[in-house]
């Protein structure tokens, strides 16, 4: 849906720019303002009150969305031997070691997440400049550097997402599809927000959640009340 299209303008007119919405209201509006031609992804953007230039204010983590993302992630696994066999059995889409690294160096990036066993990380470091900027570098903090490749693959295939603050102090993550029930979207939002709040750096001062916007890939942004940090599926009290 182009921002200049009639459909986009009509969708944008449904949003009151003089107010902020509860997570449940935002989920309903996201569904209403999404293009009817495709099952659009519902995304969240959050501006955090942190300084990402400071190492102690880096916000990152993972969350298992209770209702999944609506998309089965493609997973790459760096492993050999029995661990590689376990990754294949768990449903990994591409598994390898030096061969997979060479393939990625050649331009292959047809996967949404990457997992590595600890013994492979020295090799994977050779492609850190390729994977890192795309948020694909395996990391122990997100559970993607692990000897238990079966669990890691199952978690990601089951709706586990990663979040990481960017240089502008923004977080971006997916909470589902426009075809989801609004309560499922609100519950996914709540699960992610709980983890983001838990990840708040102790050195962060002032307001942590500065701005929250929900949108679909085809629709306008919907401002969400950043002070709502519980009871995500409740209708707001009418004033």
From Swiss-Prot:
Keywords from the named record: Repressor, Ribonucleoprotein, Ribosomal protein, RNA-binding, rRNA-binding, Translation regulation, tRNA-binding
Pfam families: Ribosomal_L1
Recorded GO CC terms: large ribosomal subunit
Biological process, per Gene Ontology: regulation of translation; translation
InterPro entries: Ribosom_uL1_bac-type, Ribosomal_uL1, Ribosomal_uL1-like, Ribosomal_uL1/biogenesis, Ribosomal_uL1_3-a/b-sand, Ribosomal_uL1_CS
UniProt keyword Amino-acid biosynthesis present: no
NCBIfam families cross-referenced by the UniProt entry: rplA_bact
Function: Binds directly to 23S rRNA. The L1 stalk is quite mobile in the ribosome, and is involved in E site tRNA release.
Name of the featured protein: Large ribosomal subunit protein uL1
Organism: Mycolicibacterium gilvum (strain PYR-GCK)
Name of the encoding gene: rplA
């Amino acid at each position: 849906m182009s921002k200049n299209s009639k459909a986009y303008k009509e969708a944008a007119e449904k949003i009151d720019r003089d107010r902020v919405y509860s997570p449940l209201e935002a989920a309903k509006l996201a569904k209403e303002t999404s293009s009817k031609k495709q099952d659009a992804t519902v995304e969240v953007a959050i501006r955090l009150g942190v300084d990402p230039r400071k190492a102690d204010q880096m916000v990152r983590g993972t969350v298992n969305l209770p209702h999944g993302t609506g998309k089965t992630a493609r997973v790459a696994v760096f492993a050999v031997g029995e661990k590689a066999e376990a990754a294949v059995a768990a449903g990994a889409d591409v598994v390898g070691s030096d061969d997979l690294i060479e393939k990625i160096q050649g331009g292959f990036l047809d996967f949404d997440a990457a997992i590595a066993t600890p013994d492979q990380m020295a090799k994977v470091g050779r492609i850190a400049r390729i994977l890192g900027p795309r948020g694909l570098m395996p990391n122990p903090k997100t559970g993607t550097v692990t000897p238990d490749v079966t669990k890691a693959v199952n978690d990601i295939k089951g709706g586990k997402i990663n979040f990481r603050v960017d240089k502008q102090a923004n977080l971006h993550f997916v909470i589902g599809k426009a075809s989801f029930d609004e309560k499922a979207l609100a519950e996914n939002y709540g699960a992610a927000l709980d983890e983001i709040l838990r990840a708040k750096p102790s050195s962060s001062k002032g307001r942590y959640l500065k701005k929250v916007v929900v949108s679909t890939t085809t629709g306008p942004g919907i401002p969400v009340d950043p002070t709502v940090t519980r009871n995500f599926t409740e209708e707001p009290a009418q004033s």
